């Protein structure tokens, strides 16, 4: 007697489903790791593709998966590989890490953007960790520190905040002395 998980399908652009293949995106484990997903998150997600835990828990450690897995929860119907769900799950793993663990994983991206610089990496990590869902996003998220992107003046126009190009200048000028009086430049002090 043997048991296997149901077939994994991929969602096509037209909304239909077909057998998971490369046209749906990265399908191999190493490809997913290269795309910024953590091995633990990939394993967790794949386990959930054809199996439903009794308590509907979604985030597991590897040990937790081994303890909770039961063939009673295996579904007979096909599963659809959802990259958005995998990305969400990966973000949960990243946020659950200690700041030190996240910093260590982010270091290759930090060094890619700042190759000759030694910064307080944990401060940068404390800002990024709540926002990052895949490791390969980090270099793009911090690239503006090295080279400022072009910003459109429309950035200062917001109907909800009632800002326009004229009153935005006044608001920014009023913010300068307030920021200059800050003793410490921390997120808490600035907000």
Name each model-derived stretch.
Residues 1-94, 189-191:
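Alpha-helical recognition segments enriched in aromatics with Gly/Pro capping
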Residues 99-191:
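Small-residue-rich helix-loop
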């Amino acid at each position: 007697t043997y048991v296997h998980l149901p077939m994994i399908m991929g969602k096509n652009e037209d909304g239909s489903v077909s057998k998971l293949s490369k046209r749906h995106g990265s399908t191999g484990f190493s490809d997913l790791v290269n795309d910024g997903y953590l091995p633990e998150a990939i394993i967790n997600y794949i386990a959930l593709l054809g199996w439903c835990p009794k308590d509907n828990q979604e985030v597991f450690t590897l040990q937790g998966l081994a303890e909770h897995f039961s063939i009673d929860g295996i579904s007979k119907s096909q599963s659809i590989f959802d990259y958005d769900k995998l990305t969400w799950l990966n973000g949960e793993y990243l946020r659950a890490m200690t700041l030190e663990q996240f910093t260590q994983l982010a270091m290759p991206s930090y060094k890619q953007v700042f190759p000759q610089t030694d910064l307080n990496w944990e401060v940068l990590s404390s800002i990024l960790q709540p926002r990052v869902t895949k490791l390969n996003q980090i270099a793009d998220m911090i690239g503006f520190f090295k080279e400022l992107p072009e910003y459109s003046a429309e950035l200062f126009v917001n109907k909800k905040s009632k800002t326009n190009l004229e009153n935005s200048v006044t608001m920014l000028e009023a913010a300068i002395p307030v920021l200059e009086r800050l003793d410490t430049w921390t997120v808490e002090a600035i907000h």
